[in-house]
Amino acid sequence: MKIFVNGTFDILHRGHLEMLRYAKGLGDYLLVAIDSDRRVTELKGPTRPVNNEIDRQFFIKSLKWVDDCWIFNSEEELVHIIETIKPDIMVKGSDYQGKPIVGEQYCKEIRFYEHTGHSTTKTIHRIANR
């Protein structure tokens, strides 16, 4: 079974790792797509990302649970990736429950992962306020 996850994965933290481990446990192949630098800046502001897309992709591909990882520049590219791989399950954070999910029409099932309270934005604020 193919499992799909997408996200920014800017400063990798325990919450990311726990979600990716959970996702891998659902199937045979874990496929991940990460937002490009341009997209992260558009979504999160001019000071982001902290880590560039090549480094973020390297970090994600280095994880034992991840079988492949792509970078996408737009919602249209993300839909194309999802449509092409046709994942059996897409894993999203629980904050996406009740909201439209990009590419969901190309997945057999959506699973929601309950966040542990970790976040890159919280980490950045904590560091900045020291």
What are the residue ranges of the model-derived segments?
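Nucleotidyltransferase catalytic core that binds NTPs
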Residues: 1-130
